Each structure stands twice: as C-alpha cells, then as structure tokens.
C-alpha cells in the first residue's frame, strides 16, 4: 500500500475516534444534566433528604426553641450532632417554607459548590500535572463517575457536603498562595459548620504552619459563638451544653453504639466498620448480620479500634513528614487529599453523602495516571478494589445484595484503598519530580 494511502487511513481513523469521543463526552454531559433535572423534579414533587430537618434547626434558632430536642420531640431517625452555627447558617432560609427553600437552593448550591471544588483542584495541580483539555475532562469525569453514588446522594442535601469539602480545599489553595488569613477564614467556617473539617488544623500544626492553623482556630471560634447574637448568652450557653451532651452520648465504651444509638450499616466510619468485624454489638433487626471475626468484649474492642485509628494517624504523619518547603509542591496536594480521606474514616458518623470527600483523591489519582501514562503495578490492586465496589451499586446488583455488601463495610475499605493510592501517587510524584543529582568530577 502506498505510504500516502496509509497516512490517509490513519487520519481517517483518528478523525472517527475523535468524533466518537466528542459524542461520548456530550452524552455524559447530557446525562449529568439529566441527573440534576431528575433530582430537581423529585424535590419539586416533595422534599427529600435531611434538608427539612436542617431548615427546622434554623427555624428553632430564630424562635428560641431547642436546637437539640429529645427523642420525644424530634424524628427518631434524626439526631442533631452539628454545632449551633449550623442552625444559624440555615436561618435565612426560613424566609420560605422548607419545601420552597430546598427548590430555590438546590441548583445554585450544588453546581456552585462542585464548580468551586473543581476550580480549586485544577489550579492546585495544573503547574505539576499539566493536562490538555481532553485529558483534563476525562480526569474529572472518571473521578465523578467513581464517586457518582456519593455525588447523587448529596443531591438530596442540596450539595451541602460538597460545599464543606470545597471550603476546606479553598483554604488549602489560598494557603499555597500565602494568604493564610483568608485560608484560615475559609477553613474556620467549614469547622464551625461541621467539626470533622478540623482535622486540617492538626495537619497544619504538624507541618509547622502556625499562621493558618491559628487563623482557622480563631475564625472557627468566632463563627461558633456567632449564634449568641440571636440566642442571647443564657440560651446560647444552654445550646452549647446540649450539644456537648449529644457528643458525649456516643462515648458509651461500646464501639457498636454511637451518637445515634446502635450503629447502622450505613455509617461508613472506621470505628463502626471495625466494630462489626471484631465484636458482637446491638444492630437493628432489619439489617444484615455480618461475620464477627473475633467476638471481642466491647471494652477490649474499643481499645483495639483506638489503637488501629491511632496507628493509622501516626503512620500517615510519618509518611508525609513535617517539612513543607515550597507550599505549591504537588506533595502537599496529595497530603491534603489524604487528610480529606482520614476525615471520613475518623469521623463518628460518615454517611454516603459525606463521602463526596473522596472526590479530591479520585481526581488526583486520575490526573496522575493520565500525566505519567499509568500507575505502578502494585497500585492496580487497590485501584481494582475501588472499581470493584462500583459493581455493588444498588442499581446493578439490586437492593438486597447491595444491602448485604454494605454490611461488610465495602465503602470503608474503598476509602482506605484510596488513601493507599493517594500516598502511592504522592511517592510517585515526589520521585519523578526530584532533581537529578549532578555527578561530581
């Protein structure tokens, strides 16, 4: 065959591939828009998720009612573990009914939060993992497809959990630009809304970044006490006391019992996941019975779980080291993705919609694989497990089997696998970007 004909055939095949890819990209964008439209239609039809409970907290704040009502005063499935500022953040929404407020907030909150997070991740990595537009699209798309079950669950909450992740990561971005006070304000706001974001403070302290750590603590305190303006000193003191009582309720000495009572299988935090494996604890009769490997007494199991969690933290701290050097290094971004994953593992409560916190790690792993043309072979094992968990989605295997697999905490082990992958990518990037020593003469 003539060389010119071969070249023409290659160009034609390449053109067909590009057209197919453009159609696939368009189909995915349309599908994403369709998912948003579907959930908006659900919300218009009737309120969904816990949004109405959060709206009620804002309403209670303004009318002087308790933010932490007893079981007799609130739905048995909902207990408020959030700081008082969470109610204050929802207070402006009480200008409308809970249903109308959810309709109004859904699209701006969800799209705005996701856009801010994607913008932040792009600007944190573009100098180290420069991808063309095509690969950049697929890095974000694959990350969102893997996290789709979590992203779709957060739609019922109007994207508030994506917003919390975006606030914490915007703080990281501003810190890398030496704007510590702005970063501290953003992180402090996230902490005042939900305490688990506070894990970034020990990270910055470990890295000797005193300014942003101090700023985050200061702003977290300012936002936390802000409701005193509405509630008054006496009522606010009662709010704090009741909140502490809710938090203390989870310290039963039995790892199978948390803030909400017997831990449901939908709590993907590390403590209840380990408890289901090593001790016999109370469970709801409607939930599947999982295999206990050790059947340890509750006190012994608590000590074992505490040791495992502490070991995980210490291992992470030792692997990342205390040195920062240049704040804009890619290693810092991987480390913060690891902190986001640890927040999910170490939190007392981690529901499916909280797991949108895996998105930064997923994006970094995808971007790293695209930039370096793949990942080391050993990383295929944890990556394979992460992809395998997608099969156990309710839409694929059915409600019953998905329910049974959830009882074995497959999502918890997925988060751990992502932590291993994130640290592996960090090691790969540090090794690839290290300067080559000049041979001595």
Regions from the PLM with identified roles:
Residues 108-112, 159-167, 190-196, 217, ...:
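Membrane-embedded alpha-helical segments of multi-pass membrane proteins
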Residues 95, 123, 204, 363-364, ...:
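Active-site catalytic microenvironments for nucleophilic, acid-base chemistry
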Residues 2, 6-183, 207-334, 342-345, ...:
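Primarily membrane-embedded glycan-assembly and transfer machineries that use lipid-linked glycans
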């Amino acid at each position: 065959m003539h060389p010119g004909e071969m070249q023409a055939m290659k160009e034609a095949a390449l053109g067909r591939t590009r057209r197919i890819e453009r159609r696939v990209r368009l189909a995915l964008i349309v599908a994403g828009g369709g998912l948003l439209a579907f959930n908006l239609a659900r919300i218009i039809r009737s309120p969904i998720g816990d949004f109405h409970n959060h709206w009620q907290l804002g309403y209670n704040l303004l009318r002087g009612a308790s933010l932490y009502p007893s079981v007799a005063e609130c739905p048995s499935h909902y207990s408020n573990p959030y700081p008082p500022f969470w109610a204050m953040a929802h207070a402006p929404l009480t200008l409308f009914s809970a249903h109308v407020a959810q309709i109004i907030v859904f699209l701006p909150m969800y799209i705005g939060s996701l856009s801010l997070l994607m913008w932040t991740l792009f600007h944190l990595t573009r100098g180290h993992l420069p991808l063309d537009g095509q690969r950049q699209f697929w890095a974000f798309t694959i990350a969102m497809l893997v996290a789709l079950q979590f992203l779709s669950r957060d739609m019922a909450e109007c994207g508030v959990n994506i917003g919390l992740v975006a606030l914490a990561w915007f703080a990281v971005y501003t810190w890398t630009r030496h704007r510590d006070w702005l970063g501290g304000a953003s992180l402090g706001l996230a902490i005042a809304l939900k305490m688990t974001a506070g894990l970034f403070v020990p990270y910055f302290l470990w890295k000797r970044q005193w300014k942003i750590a101090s700023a985050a603590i200061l702003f977290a305190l300012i936002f936390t006490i802000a409701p005193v303006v509405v509630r008054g000193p006496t009522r606010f003191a009662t709010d704090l006391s009741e909140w502490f009582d809710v938090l203390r309720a989870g310290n039963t000495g039995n790892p199978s019992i948390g803030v909400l009572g017997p831990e449901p299988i939908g709590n993907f935090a590390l403590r209840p996941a380990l408890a289901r494996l090593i001790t016999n604890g109370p469970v709801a009769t409607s939930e599947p019975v999982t295999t206990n490997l050790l059947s340890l007494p509750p006190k012994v199991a608590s000590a074992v779980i505490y040791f495992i969690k502490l070991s995980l933290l210490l291992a992470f701290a030792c692997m990342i080291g205390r040195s920062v050097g240049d704040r804009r290094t890619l290693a810092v971004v991987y480390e913060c993705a690891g902190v986001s994953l640890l927040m999910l593992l170490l939190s007392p409560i981690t529901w499916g919609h909280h797991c949108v916190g895996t998105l930064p790690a997923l994006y970094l792993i995808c971007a790293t694989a695209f930039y370096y043309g793949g990942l080391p072979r050993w990383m295929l094992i944890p990556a394979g497990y992460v992809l395998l968990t997608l099969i156990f989605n309710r839409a694929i295997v059915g409600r019953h089997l998905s329910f049974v697999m959830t009882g074995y905490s497959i999502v918890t082990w997925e988060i751990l696998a992502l932590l291993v992958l994130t640290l592996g990518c960090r090691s790969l990037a540090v090794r690839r970007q290290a300067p080559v020593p000049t041979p001595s003469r």
